From Swiss-Prot:
Extent of Basic residues compositional bias: 922-934
Gene: AGBL3
Database matches in InterPro entries: Cytosolic_carboxypeptidase (IPR050821), Pepdidase_M14_N (IPR040626), Peptidase_M14 (IPR000834)
Protein's job: Metallocarboxypeptidase that mediates deglutamylation of tubulin and non-tubulin target proteins. Catalyzes the removal of polyglutamate side chains present on the gamma-carboxyl group of glutamate residues within the C-terminal tail of tubulin protein. Specifically cleaves tubulin long-side-chains, while it is not able to remove the branching point glutamate. Also catalyzes the removal of polyglutamate residues from the carboxy-terminus of non-tubulin proteins such as MYLK. May catalyze the hydrolysis of aspartate from the carboxy-terminus of target proteins.
Protein name: Cytosolic carboxypeptidase 3
Active site: E534 (proton donor/acceptor)
Organism this protein belongs to: Bos taurus (Bovine)
Chief location of this protein within or outside the cell: cytoplasm
Residues reported to bind Zn(2+): H364, E367, H460
Stored SUPFAM superfamilies: Zn-dependent exopeptidases
Length: 1003
C-alpha cells in the first residue's frame, strides 16, 4: 500500500495529518490578480485531457490555462471573501430582522449573591380572561416534529399583541437564542411570564432570554416566570437574574449585570397531571425611561457570536497558520458544526508522535457558560505566550466549540431539533437524527487509530450546585492505580484554581442513565481521562470569591487554568504528579473513615464488604492499616445472595413473633419479671453515657454473652431477652422472688470472658457490677464464654446474625410489623449491653498503630476490672494510646444516646484529648470531605503551591512503624486498679495524655 493511501481520510470533512503539517493544499481565496483573469470550468472547454467536471477551474495566466481545484464553499464556513453562513431556522419560527448585539464588559467588583430576608412574596395567579396578553409567540407545537428549515424562519408578517401603550412594557424574544412564550399583565406594574419549552418537547423550561422596551425609571416592576419544572434551583441559594441596558452600555460602557430584589423560587398551583410547576419572581427598577433592556438566565453566547469569533481567527494571518477551521458536519436544520484543529505545523513525521486532546462544548444549548469557558481556552491556546506555544508544539487539539447549533439558534435549553438530548445519544447509530454527536464519535475513533488521546473533556453548565467541578469515570474493577490516576487532573485543576474549582464536588461514578453521555462513551472507547466539566450558573463558595457570582472573565479564566493543569499533568518532571497521587491516597483513607463514622446504620458485615470492594482492600499493607488482619480474614468469606421470602413465609414470621410477644406478656402478667437494675423505665433511659456520639464504639451491634436462665416458679426465663420494668412492680414481689429474679442469692461476681477466636465478640472481662437492693450487696453468678475453635465459621455466623436494618431492607420486602420487631430487638440489645459498663475509647489522632491493633485483636485478652464497693461511684482510669487513623474503622457508631441527668459517665480530662482526634473533634469532622489548596499548620513555608512537607499524621505513621518493628508481640497493658487512681492527675503514656472516666450510678 502506498504512503498516500495510508493518509487519514476523514469522510466527515475533518482535517488530515497532511493538513496539520503542511500549508493548505487547496488554493487560496481568489486574489486581485486572479479576479482580472478569465475563469472557466473544465466542462466548458473541449479539451480531451480534462474530465468534464465543475470542480476544476481554469485560470488564464501568463498566456496559458492553469487548472485549479475548486474548494468547496462550506469546507470552512467562515472566510474573508464573503459574509458569514446565514443561520437557518425551522420554517414556522418567527424571527425579527433586528440583530441583537451586546458589549463585553466585566464589573470591577464581584457581584454578591442575594441574601433572602424571609419577607419575599410568592405571587399565585389564576387564569382570568380579563388579563391583558402583552406578548404571545407562535405556537411551539404547531408541528409535531421538525419538517424543514429556511433562512430567516417564517416569512409572514410578525404579529404584535398590543399597541405601544404609555405604561405597558413591550416584550420581544423572536431573535437568536431568545426564549419567551407568553406575557400577561396581571397588575399595573406586574407581569406574569411563561417561557417556551424546547421545540418538539413539552419540558425543559429553564432558559429565558427576552427583550423589554417602553420602560419607566423609578417604578418597581415585578416579573414572575411561572412554568419552571425543576424543584431545586440556584435562585433559592442567592443567584440573581442578569440584566442588560442599551443606554447603560452606550453611556457608561456597562454590560450584563446581576440585579433583582425580592427574589423567590417556589412551587405554584399550576400543576397539571400531578406535575407541579415552579415560579421565579423578582422586582426591579429600570435605570432609564424609554430604554431597551434584556433579561437572561446566563450570559448569552449565540451561534452568530461563534461564527464571528471563528471568522476573526481565520482572518488573522498568525493564528490561522496553526488553527485550521473545518466543518465537521451539518445539523438536521443544515447549520454547520465547526471543528478546529490546533497544533504547530510540521513538515516531517514528528507530528504523528504528538498526543491529542479533545474538547467539546454546548451540547446543551442553554448552558451558555460552557461557551465562555471554551472562548477562554481558545484565547489562551491561540495566544503568544510561551506556555501556549509549548502546548501547540506538544499536542494536537481537536475542538468542537458548539455541538448543538440548532438548539442554540431557537433558544432551547437542552435538546436539539430532534427533540432529544444529544448527550444521551452518543451510542446511537442514527446519523441523520444526531449528526453532531455521531460525527464527533467517528472523528475521535479515527483519531485514536493514529495517535493517543490523553484527555477528553465536555464542557457543561450546572443549575443546582455552586462552583466548577468535574465528573469522571471509575470502572467496576477499581484498580488502585487507575482509580487514583483518574482523579489527578481534577486535583491539579483545583490547586491551580482554588477559588473556583471544587475537587470535593467531583464525582467519578458511572450511572446507568449516563451510559449514553460523551464522557462515558469516550471512556469505554479507551480514553482514560474522560471528563465532563460542570460550571455553575451562580457563583463560588470558595476562597476570596465566596458568596459572589461568576462573570464572563471568571468563566474564561477556567480555560487558562485548564491549559495550565494540562501542562502540569504532562510535565516530564513528575514531582507534581506523584505528589497529587500521594495526596489522593491519603484522602481516600480519610473519606473511608468518614463514611464509616457518618453511616450510623452500617453493620460490621457491610463495613467488611465495603473494605473488600474498595480500592485499598487489595493494596493495603500491614504497616499503614490497623485492620489488615480483619481484611485477611474477611477476604476468605464468600457471601451468599439472600433469597427473597414469599408472602406465606413473611406471614408465618409475623405470626411467630406475635406468639413470642404474647408469651412474654403472659409472663409479665403473672409477675415473673426480671430487672437487672433498680431504676425504673425512665431511669433506664437516663443511664446512657453523656458524651459525644463520635466517641462511642459500636458495641451495640455485637452479640451479647450467653446469659443462661433463671428458674422462677417452675418457669424458664432467658435473661438475654427481657424487658425493663418499673420499681413499683418489683416491690410487689416477695423478698424471695426478688432475690430469685435479681440473682442476689447467687455468687457475688459475674465475669464475661472474651472468646479468643471471636473477632466480633467482646474483648473484655467485666467484674463486680453493682446492683444493690435494700442496701444489700448483689451477688452475680460467674458465667464464662467458651471460645469457639472454628474462627471462620464463627465470623460468618456473627456477621449473618447482626446485619443492619438498612442492609436487610435492601434484600427483603419488610412489612411494618417486621420493621417494628427488628427495631424492638435492637433496642432490647442496646439496653442490655449498657449494664456491662463497656469501656468507651476516644479516637485519638496520635495513637500508635501497634497498640490499637491489640485493642481489636481477638487474641489479646485485656481486662478492665472494677472492685466491688458499697458506694455508688466506680472510678475507671483509662490510658489513651497513640495510633494512626485506620483506613476503615469498623467499630465506631453515631447512634444517638439519651444523656443521663446524673451524668454517670464523665470524662475528667476532656480537653486534653480533644486535640488528638483524627477529625479534629466532633465539630470538625467534615473537614476531610473538602479539599482545599491551602497551607495547613503541619506544612512548612513552601516556595510555591506545589511544595509541601509531610504532615503530622505521616510523621506519626512513621513512628508507629518503628514501634511495630520493635514490639511485634506486645500486648495491651491492664488498666490500673480504680481505687489507686482516685484523685490522681492525668499522666502521659507514650507521649500522649491519659484521661479518667468516672462512673456514678444512682442507688
Amino acid at each position: 500500500m502506498s504512503e498516500d493511501s495510508e493518509k487519514e481520510d476523514y469522510s466527515d470533512r475533518t482535517i488530515s495529518d497532511e493538513d496539520e503539517s503542511d500549508e493548505d493544499n487547496f488554493m487560496k481565496f481568489v486574489n486581485e490578480d486572479i479576479h482580472q483573469c478569465a475563469l472557466l470550468t473544465a466542462d466548458s472547454i473541449s479539451d480531451p485531457f480534462f474530465p468534464r467536471t465543475t470542480q476544476i477551474l481554469l485560470e488564464y495566466q501568463l498566456g496559458r490555462w492553469v487548472p485549479r481545484l475548486r474548494k468547496p464553499r462550506d469546507l470552512y464556513g467562515v472566510s474573508s471573501s464573503g459574509p458569514l453562513s446565514p443561520t437557518r431556522w425551522p420554517y414556522h419560527c418567527e424571527v425579527i430582522d433586528e440583530k441583537i448585539e451586546h458589549i463585553d464588559w466585566t464589573p470591577s467588583n464581584p457581584e454578591p449573591m442575594y441574601i433572602p430576608t424571609g419577607l419575599e412574596v410568592e405571587p399565585l395567579y389564576a387564569n382570568s380572561k380579563e388579563e391583558t396578553v402583552v406578548y404571545l409567540a407562535e405556537d411551539a407545537y404547531k408541528e409535531p416534529c421538525f419538517v424543514y428549515s429556511r433562512v430567516g424562519g417564517n416569512r409572514t408578517p410578525l404579529k404584535q399583541p398590543v399597541d405601544n401603550c404609555d405604561d405597558t412594557l413591550m416584550f420581544e424574544a423572536r431573535f437568536e437564542s431568545g426564549n419567551l412564550q407568553k406575557v400577561v399583565k396581571v397588575g399595573e406594574y406586574e407581569y406574569q411570564l411563561t417561557v417556551r419549552p424546547d421545540l418538539f418537547t413539552n419540558k425543559h423550561t429553564q432558559w429565558y432570554y427576552f427583550q423589554v422596551t417602553n420602560t419607566q425609571a423609578g417604578i418597581v416592576y415585578r416579573f414572575t416566570i411561572t412554568n419552571f419544572t425543576k424543584p431545586a434551583s440556584l435562585y433559592n441559594r442567592g443567584m440573581r437574574p442578569l440584566f442588560y441596558s442599551e443606554k447603560e452600555a452606550s453611556a457608561h460602557n456597562i454590560g450584563w449585570q446581576r440585579i433583582g430584589d425580592q427574589i423567590k423560587y417556589y412551587r405554584n398551583n399550576q400543576g397539571q397531571d400531578r406535575h407541579h410547576h415552579f415560579s421565579l419572581t423578582w422586582t426591579f427598577q429600570f435605570p432609564h425611561s424609554k430604554d431597551t433592556c434584556y433579561f437572561a438566565h446566563c450570559y448569552p453566547y449565540t451561534y452568530t457570536n461563534l461564527q464571528e469569533y471563528l471568522s476573526g481567527i481565520n482572518n488573522d494571518p498568525v493564528r490561522s497558520k496553526f488553527c485550521k477551521i473545518r466543518v465537521l458536519c451539518h445539523t438536521i436544520a443544515r447549520n454547520m458544526v465547526y471543528i478546529l484543529t490546533i497544533t504547530t505545523p510540521l513538515k516531517n513525521s514528528e507530528s504523528r508522535k504528538r498526543k491529542a486532546v479533545i474538547l467539546t462544548a454546548r451540547v446543551h444549548p442553554g448552558e451558555t457558560n460552557s461557551s465562555w469557558i471554551m472562548k477562554g481556552f481558545l484565547d489562551y491556546i491561540l495566544g503568544n505566550s510561551s506556555d501556549a506555544k509549548l502546548l501547540r508544539d506538544t499536542f494536537v487539539f481537536k475542538v468542537v466549540p458548539m455541538l448543538n447549533p440548532d438548539g442554540v439558534i431557537v433558544g432551547n435549553y437542552r435538546c436539539s431539533l430532534a427533540g432529544r438530548d444529544l448527550n444521551r445519544n452518543y451510542t446511537s447509530l442514527l446519523k441523520e437524527s444526531f449528526p453532531s454527536v455521531w460525527y464527533t464519535r467517528n472523528m475521535i475513533r479515527r483519531l485514536m487509530e493514529k495517535r493517543e488521546v490523553i484527555l477528553y473533556c465536555d464542557l457543561h453548565g450546572h443549575s443546582k450546585k455552586e462552583n466548577i467541578f468535574m465528573y469522571g469515570c471509575d470502572g467496576s474493577d477499581r484498580c488502585k492505580a487507575l482509580y487514583l490516576q483518574q482523579r489527578i487532573f481534577p486535583l491539579m485543576l483545583s490547586k491551580n484554581c482554588p477559588d473556583k474549582f471544587s475537587f470535593s464536588s467531583c464525582k467519578f461514578n458511572i450511572q446507568k442513565s449516563k451510559e449514553g453521555t460523551g464522557r462515558v462513551v469516550m471512556w469505554k472507547m479507551g480514553i482514560r481521562n474522560s471528563f465532563t466539566m460542570e460550571a455553575t450558573f451562580c457563583g463560588s463558595t470558595l476562597g476570596n470569591k465566596r458568596g459572589t457570582h461568576f462573570n464572563t472573565k471568571d468563566l474564561e479564566s477556567m480555560g487558562y487554568h485548564f491549559c495550565d493543569s494540562l501542562l502540569d499533568y504532562c510535565d516530564p518532571d513528575r514531582t507534581k504528579y506523584y505528589q497529587c497521587l500521594k495526596e489522593l491516597d491519603e484522602m481516600e483513607k480519610h473519606i473511608n473513615l468518614e463514611k464509616v463514622i457518618d453511616d450510623s446504620d452500617t453493620s460490621l458485615k457491610e463495613i467488611t464488604l465495603d473494605l473488600e470492594t474498595s480500592s485499598h482492600a487489595s493494596d493495603s499493607s500491614e504497616s499503614n492499616d490497623s485492620q489488615t488482619d480483619l481484611l485477611k480474614l474477611n477476604s476468605q468469606i464468600k457471601t451468599k445472595k439472600k433469597q427473597l421470602k414469599t408472602k406465606k413465609e413473611r406471614n408465618s414470621t409475623i405470626e411467630r413473633h406475635q406468639n413470642i410477644r404474647e408469651e412474654e406478656q403472659e409472663v409479665c402478667d403473672k409477675g415473673h419479671l426480671v430487672q437487672r437494675h433498680k431504676e425504673s423505665d425512665s431511669d433506664v433511659t437516663d443511664t446512657r453515657p453523656s458524651i459525644s456520639d463520635d466517641c462511642i464504639f459500636d458495641y451495640f451491634r455485637r452479640q451479647l454473652p450467653n446469659q443462661g436462665f433463671f428458674k422462677i416458679l417452675g418457669l424458664k426465663f432467658y435473661c438475654g431477652y427481657t424487658h425493663m420494668i418499673s420499681q413499683t412492680v418489683i416491690q410487689k414481689l416477695s423478698r424471695d422472688q426478688q432475690r430469685c429474679v435479681l440473682g442476689t442469692d447467687k455468687k457475688n461476681q459475674e465475669t464475661v470472658q472474651p472468646r479468643n477466636n471471636d473477632l466480633y465478640g467482646n474483648c473484655i472481662k467485666v467484674t463486680s457490677l453493682k446492683c444493690p437492693l435494700n442496701k444489700q450487696t448483689p451477688i452475680w453468678t460467674e458465667k464464662t464464654r467458651i471460645p469457639t475453635e472454628d474462627l471462620h465459621h464463627n465470623l460468618k455466623s456473627n456477621m449473618k446474625e447482626c446485619p443492619s436494618f438498612q442492609s436487610k431492607k435492601a434484600d427483603i420486602n419488610w412489612t411494618d410489623d417486621e420493621k417494628r420487631i427488628y427495631r424492638d430487638k435492637n433496642i432490647a440489645q442496646t439496653q442490655e449491653i449498657l449494664q456491662y459498663l463497656l469501656p468507651i475509647m476516644r479516637s485519638t489522632k496520635n495513637v500508635q498503630t501497634t497498640q490499637i491493633k491489640e485493642v481489636f485483636n481477638p487474641r489479646t485478652s485485656f481486662q478492665i476490672q472494677h472492685q466491688q464497693k458499697p458506694s455508688s461511684n466506680i472510678n475507671i482510669r483509662k490510658c489513651s494510646t497513640s495510633w494512626t487513623p485506620p483506613r476503615n474503622l469498623p467499630l465506631i457508631s453515631q447512634r444517638t444516646l439519651i444523656v443521663s441527668t446524673s451524668k454517670w459517665l464523665q470524662p475528667l480530662d476532656w480537653k486534653s484529648s480533644e486535640s488528638s482526634l483524627p477529625l479534629g473533634g466532633p465539630k470538625k469532622r467534615r473537614k476531610y470531605s473538602r479539599v482545599k489548596a491551602t497551607k495547613t499548620k503541619d506544612m512548612k513555608a513552601a516556595s510555591s503551591k506545589w511544595e509541601m512537607t509531610p504532615s503530622s499524621s505521616e510523621k506519626d505513621a512513621d513512628k508507629s512503624l518503628q514501634a511495630e518493628g520493635s514490639s511485634q508481640q506486645g500486648t495491651m497493658q491492664t488498666a490500673p486498679h480504680p481505687t489507686k487512681t482516685k484523685g490522681e492527675q492525668p499522666k502521659k503514656k507514650h507521649g500522649q495524655p491519659a484521661f479518667h472516666l468516672k462512673l456514678q450510678r444512682d442507688t
